[in-house]
């Protein structure tokens, strides 16, 4: 990622309180409240992995909420070192979303937050397969939403940002997942929409229900 990646990390150097303020201003609800609504069935000792944890702000918020078994992978060393300094009790390692270095079903929750939007369409199915493989129960996401896949120019660069219906992609790719909850979050100042979604894996595929 080089200098571009470092600039991304520096732009996203937020505290959980600052993140809550950002969400409140943009969506009219805090990130903490969304987390509480979506994770109410997830115990605080659940093993949770964030794929693409950057500086660890999402994990730090989960830690403040009482979650104690936190893990993260991040491909960029600059961001990872800062995440480790903020989260000394979490297990954070350098790795790619294309090849998560953990066993099948190792985590109770695997999640992304603003990460799938940066995965090239040609790699998206593979990344989703890795997320699905490592989760034994829950897949949680917060990503840009669009009913149709679309590329978005990103700070003067092409082929770096896309939006689509990521929850639907999971449902179409995996027969054993059920969409438990989704909230479409409309921006207060423009027409953009983001989506938070929670999917559950079922050992018996007959129990899985998606749209």
Segments (PLM) and residue ranges:
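A conserved beta-strand element that flanks and buttresses the S-adenosyl-L-methionine
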Residues: 111
């Amino acid at each position: 990622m080089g200098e571009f990646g470092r600039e991304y990390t520096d732009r996203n150097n937020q505290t959980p309180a600052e993140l809550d303020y950002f969400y409140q201003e943009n969506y009219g609800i805090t990130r903490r409240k969304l987390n509480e609504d979506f994770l109410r069935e997830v115990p605080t000792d659940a093993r949770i992995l964030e794929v693409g944890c950057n500086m660890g702000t999402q994990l730090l918020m989960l830690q403040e909420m009482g979650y104690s078994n936190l893990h993260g992978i991040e491909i960029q060393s600059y961001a990872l070192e800062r995440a480790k300094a903020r989260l000394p009790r979490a297990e954070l390692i350098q790795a790619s979303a294309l090849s998560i270095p953990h066993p099948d079903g190792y985590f109770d929750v695997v999640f992304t937050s603003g990460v799938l939007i940066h995965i090239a369409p040609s790699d998206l199915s593979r990344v989703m397969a890795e997320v699905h493989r490592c989760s034994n129960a829950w897949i949680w996401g917060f990503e840009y939403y669009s009913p149709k896949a679309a590329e978005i120019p990103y700070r003067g660069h092409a082929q770096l940002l896309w939006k689509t219906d990521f929850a639907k992609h999971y449902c179409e790719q995996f027969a054993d997942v059920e969409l438990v909850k989704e909230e479409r979050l409309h921006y207060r100042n423009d027409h953009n929409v983001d989506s938070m979604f929670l999917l559950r894996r079922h050992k018996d595929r007959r129990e899985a229900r998606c749209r």
